[in-house]
Amino acid sequence: RPVMPQNFLIDPVATDINSALGCAVDEFVSSHLVEQLQESGVYRDEPLSIASSDFNLEPDQELTTFSEDKVRLTKYYGLVPTHLLKEAMQDPDAEDEEVVEFSEEDEENYYTEAMIVIANGGILLKAEKNPYMMQDRPVVAFPWDVVPSRFWGRGVCEKGYNSQKALDAELRA
């Protein structure tokens, strides 16, 4: 599904998704969706509070938004220090939970490709090694016009700027 540019966070010096340390989608979702995923076992069963409003994440800053029944969900896809990922994956409350084994190659690497889900800026709902077969990130970014060393590239309006200036000058002449 499409994500608004203000809700997509990426390493500032990255030129594409694969060269970034990681990327995140930061947006508000309905609290019942998070509760359903907690009940089904996808997310950890952590108590959630209502998220405070952040107008920078809202789709339209001019509309009045209601702060009830929404959770700020940050989904991070990228490299995480292996020792922190191991620590986050061990749930102290679960006795019969399966133990996730790291291969020797993962043990030697300082970073591991992972997927992290955080609610309201501080509640860890999910931490796991990258579950995708090709170990890629489930995000696709499309720059309209590629500009060297810039992730976002050049937009449609920026691309037409010089052409419009030339047409305006031609009409005035």
Predicted regions and their residues:
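Extended alpha-helical, oligomerization-prone segments that build pores/tubes and scaffolds
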Residues: 1-173
